Regions:
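Conserved beta-hairpin
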Residues: 55-67, 72
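A short, internal acetyl-CoA/4′-phosphopantetheine-binding micro-motif in the GNAT/acyltransferase core
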Residues: 77-87
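Conserved GNAT-fold acetyl-CoA-binding loop/helix
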Residues: 24-47
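Conserved acetyl-CoA-binding loop-helix of GNAT-fold acetyltransferases
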Residues: 88-101
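Residues within well-ordered alpha-helical secondary structure of globular protein domains
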Residues: 22-25, 101
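A short beta-loop-alpha structural element at the N-terminal edge
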Residues: 6-21
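Short, Lys/Arg-enriched N-terminal segments with co-localized hydrophobic residues
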Residues: 1-5
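A short helix-loop-beta-strand connector motif used in the catalytic cores of GNAT acetyltransferases and
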Residues: 47-58, 76
Length: 102
């Protein structure tokens, strides 16, 4: 069953650490076959280079960011991540639909 969308909006600079936690946890879980240290070593590159070069939108529910999508050059999905505890609720689909309709 899908989660009720409370808000999808553009990322605020003060929320970068929040989405980076989602990125790190989701990436480690999805890529269990790659050493965790690899992702931790690339954390700063993602935070300092890739996130700033993209337009990022966050999915908020229950007062927390539950997922995000980053668009590069207005037409390329550079990232789509949903918090591991919120997966399977239609959040990723909602984020995709949001950017497709912008």
């Amino acid at each position: 069953m899908g989660e009720r969308v409370l808000e999808i909006r553009e990322l605020k600079n003060c929320e970068i650490d929040d989405i980076m936690k989602i990125w790190l946890e989701s990436t480690i879980e999805a890529h269990y076959f790659i050493k965790e240290e690899y992702w931790k070593n690339n954390y700063e590159v993602v935070r300092d280079i890739y996130i700033p070069m993209a337009k990022t939108f966050v999915y908020c529910g229950e007062g927390k960011i539950k997922g995000f999508i980053s668009i590069i050059d207005s037409n390329f999905i550079g990232a789509l991540f949903v918090h591991t505890k919120s997966q399977g609720r239609g959040i990723g689909k909602s984020l995709l639909e949001y950017v497709k309709n912008r």
